């Protein structure tokens, strides 16, 4: 049901975002404790502010009331993806070149399934990271289809 809900919400929110010059980053439909949450993460090249989030929430809420894809009560949250935004699409990886990222893979690459480092290149098929390994820097090439999840990483020194 979760996948069906997120697909329906994506179809409903995309025209709203296109009209406002915004982009969809991610949709989450999750149960936390007794409550269900529908979270829609939006962004633009200039970032998003609370007024834009509120406007999207209002318009999307109207559409959700019309279509009613969720049979029970839930909380709708519309926000920016934050500093550690997920990288979901190829264009997200391309935009993140030069930034620090955290990647989990479906299977081990060079004996590891988790990587954190600078995204140095992305050609559509391979994600290239510069990572620290025992005090030295090394390059790791990760096949794009083996990426289970990825996000920007905030590094604290």
From Swiss-Prot:
Which residues, by range, are in coiled-coil regions? none
Q: Name one GO biological process term.
A: ribosomal small subunit assembly
- Signal sequence, start to end: none
- Primary localisation category: cytoplasm
Q: Transmembrane residues, as ranges?
A: none
InterPro entries for this protein: Ribosome_maturation_RimP, RimP_C, RimP_C_sf, RimP_N, RimP_N_sf
Top-level lineage group: Bacteria
Q: Which Gene3D superfamilies match?
A: Ribosome maturation factor RimP, C-terminal domain, RimP-like superfamily, N-terminal
Is the keyword Disulfide bond assigned to this protein? no
**What are its GO cellular component terms?**
cytosol
Q: Where in the cell is it found?
A: Cytoplasm
Q: Which UniProt keywords apply?
A: Cytoplasm, Ribosome biogenesis
**Pfam families, from UniProt?**
DUF150_C (PF17384), RimP_N (PF02576)
Q: Which HAMAP family match?
A: RimP (MF_01077)
Which family does the record claim for this protein? Belongs to the RimP family.
**PANTHER family (UniProt xref):** RIBOSOME MATURATION FACTOR RIMP
The UniProt function text for this chain reads: Required for maturation of 30S ribosomal subunits.
Q: What is the protein name stated in its UniProt record?
A: Ribosome maturation factor RimP
Give the species this sequence originates from. Answer: Geobacillus kaustophilus (strain HTA426)
List the gene name: rimP
């Amino acid at each position: 049901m979760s996948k069906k809900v997120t697909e329906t919400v994506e179809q409903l929110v995309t025209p709203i975002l296109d009209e406002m010059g915004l982009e969809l980053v991610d949709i989450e439909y999750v149960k936390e404790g007794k409550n269900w949450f529908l979270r829609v993460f939006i962004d633009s090249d200039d970032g998003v502010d609370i007024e834009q989030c509120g406007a999207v929430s209002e318009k999307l809420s109207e559409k959700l009331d019309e279509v009613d894809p969720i049979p029970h009560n839930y909380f709708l949250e519309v926000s920016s993806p934050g500093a550690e935004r997920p990288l979901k699409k190829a264009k997200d990886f391309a935009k993140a070149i030069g930034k620090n990222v955290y990647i989990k893979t479906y299977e081990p690459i060079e004996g590891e399934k988790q990587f954190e480092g600078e995204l140095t290149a992305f050609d559509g098929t391979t994600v290239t990271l510069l990572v620290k390994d025992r005090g030295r820097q090394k390059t790791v090439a990760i096949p794009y289809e083996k990426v289970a999840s990825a996000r920007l990483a905030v590094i604290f020194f």
